[in-house]
């Protein structure tokens, strides 16, 4: 293989021939995420190409993701379906875990949507395949819990393939009330009942995510958007969105039923498959590539989700295979030369209690502040008046995934210069050891 990657010696899964476990020749890097790298690989015995995901054991253990890895392996072995990425085999060495997976060459569905919304007939084909895969998983007691366009790949014939089962749950994970209780999923696609953390039906939560995906395919932008995470959660909780005028009445009706914030009245997967919009037959043959997107017009610009160059560069065809990349929110905690941002947000793998302790530590500097706290909120307030009254800083903690929380810190009252000084002399030093940073595996 051209550009083949040498493999470590036999103590780490290689052999004297430089092959992984004597069978696989590693080629070019396809992508990487927080915990894994994905390489093109070839089985020299069969000549078959695969996507080889390489996960560092040390990183997995460090952030407590051993169970998540085991779960992903179990789920992918259980769900064999034409629209689900297949796991061929799993190998391990002293320091790494190797997943030999189906090589999906068509890239991410996200890349198509990024160019503009899809025609309804095109979106329908993808949505039919998505629902087929999701229904298959649910019939085997498996809930994906992180469905989004970045987790949907396309093969060379344009058929959809669902990937990334790292957050999946089994029926046996249900508590006595018959509900799941772990907050999982990427914020913009998370169902309102998941945000509330009061227990939820995994099948209904997956259908909400399918509704968001369908909206994105048809509209070209997210139904729930806000620069402020708290405000976005409020919109999700209320089901506060508007369908664009170009959607057909049947499509609008289905999206609205999928994005019902009440899980008890949300449409079921059986009724989705029986809906007029869903049942309409595709015009293309099985092997005909899906048609192109619709270029977004100027009047649509206000609705689009604009991504920075750096964000776009991370969204390669295999980045989402690398174990929950969506939760590496990479702290929005950058330095500013002259002043602090009024609002900061960062991710951490520490529990909420550790975050609260660090915030209390910041408040103790100089004995100038009082602290009020709950399980998910901290308010730091100055004991004495400043130039514009007492300085008040609020922090709110959101559980986004089992191993990660998002912390939002903002000035609630007082003088900006005093807030800047508090951030640089007390808040930053207290928080610097807890916010999450990542390096490729």
From Swiss-Prot:
Q: In which tissues is it expressed?
A: Expressed in roots and shoots.
Which top EC class is named for this enzyme in its record? transferase
Q: What Pfam families does the database record attribute to this sequence?
A: NAF (PF03822), Pkinase (PF00069)
Phosphothreonine: residues bearing it: 182
Output the Gene Ontology cellular-component terms. Answer: endoplasmic reticulum
* Entry comment on modification after translation: Autophosphorylated.
Domain NAF as annotated: residue spans = 310-334
Entry's SMART domains? S_TKc
So what EC number does this one have? 2.7.11.1
Annotated binding of ATP, by residue: 30-38, 53
Q: Which cofactor does it need?
A: Mn(2+)
Q: Where is the active site?
A: 146 (proton acceptor)
Q: Without the gene, what phenotype results?
A: Delayed development and flowering.
Single GO MF annotation: ATP binding
Cite the residue spans of the region called PPI.
341-371
**Keyword Repeat part of the UniProt annotation:** no
Q: Where does the record place the region Activation loop? A: 164-193
* Domain remarks: The activation loop within the kinase domain is the target of phosphorylation/activation by upstream protein kinases. The PPI motif mediates the interaction with the ABI (abscisic acid-insensitive) phosphatases.
Q: Give the UniProt family note.
A: Belongs to the protein kinase superfamily. CAMK Ser/Thr protein kinase family. SNF1 subfamily.
Q: What is this protein called?
A: CBL-interacting serine/threonine-protein kinase 6
């Amino acid at each position: 293989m051209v550009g083949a990657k040498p493999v470590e010696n036999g103590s780490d899964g290689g052999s004297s021939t430089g092959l992984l476990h004597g069978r696989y020749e590693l080629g070019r890097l396809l992508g990487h995420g927080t915990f894994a790298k994905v390489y093109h690989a070839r089985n020299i015995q069969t000549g078959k190409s695969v996507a080889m995901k390489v996960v560092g054991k040390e990183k997995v253990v460090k952030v407590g993701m051993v169970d998540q890895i085991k779960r992903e392996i179990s789920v992918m072995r259980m769900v064999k379906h034409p629209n689900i990425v297949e796991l061929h085999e799993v190998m391990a060495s002293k320091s790494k875990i190797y997943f030999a997976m189906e090589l999906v060459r068509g890239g991410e569905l996200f890349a198509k949507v990024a160019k503009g919304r899809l025609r309804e007939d095109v979106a329908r084909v993808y949505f039919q395949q998505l629902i087929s895969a999701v229904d298959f998983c649910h019939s085997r007691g498996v809930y994906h819990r992180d469905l989004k366009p970045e987790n949907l790949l396309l093969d060379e014939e344009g058929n959809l393939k669902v990937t990334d089962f790292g957050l999946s749950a089994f029926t046996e994970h249900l508590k006595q009330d018959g509900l799941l209780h772990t907050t999982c999923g990427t914020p913009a696609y998370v169902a309102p009942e998941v945000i509330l953390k009061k227990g939820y039906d995994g099948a209904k939560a997956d259908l909400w995510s399918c509704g968001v995906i369908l909206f994105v395919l048809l509209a070209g932008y997210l139904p729930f958007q806000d620069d402020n995470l708290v405000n976005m959660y409020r919109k999700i909780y209320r089901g506060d969105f508007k369908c664009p005028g170009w959607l057909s009445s049947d499509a609008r009706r289905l999206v609205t039923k999928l994005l019902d914030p009440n899980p008890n009245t949300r449409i079921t997967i059986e009724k989705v498959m029986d809906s007029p919009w869903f049942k309409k037959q595709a015009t293309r043959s099985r092997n005909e590539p899906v048609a192109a997107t619709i270029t977004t017009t100027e009047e649509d610009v206000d609705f689009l989700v604009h991504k920075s160059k750096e964000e776009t560069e991370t969204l390669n065809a295999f980045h989402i295979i690398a174990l929950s990349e969506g939760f590496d929110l990479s702290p929005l905690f950058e330095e500013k030369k002259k002043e602090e941002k009024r609002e900061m947000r960062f991710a951490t793998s520490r529990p909420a209690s550790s975050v609260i302790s660090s915030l209390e530590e910041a408040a103790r500097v100089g004995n100038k502040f009082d602290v009020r706290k709950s399980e998910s909120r901290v308010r730091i307030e100055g004991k004495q008046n400043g130039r514009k009254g007492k300085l008040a800083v609020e922090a709110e903690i959101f559980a986004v995934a089992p191993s990660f929380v998002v912390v939002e810190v903002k000035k609630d009252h007082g003088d900006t210069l005093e807030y800047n000084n508090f951030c640089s002399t007390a808040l930053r030093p207290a928080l610097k050891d807890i916010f999450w940073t990542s390096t490729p595996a």
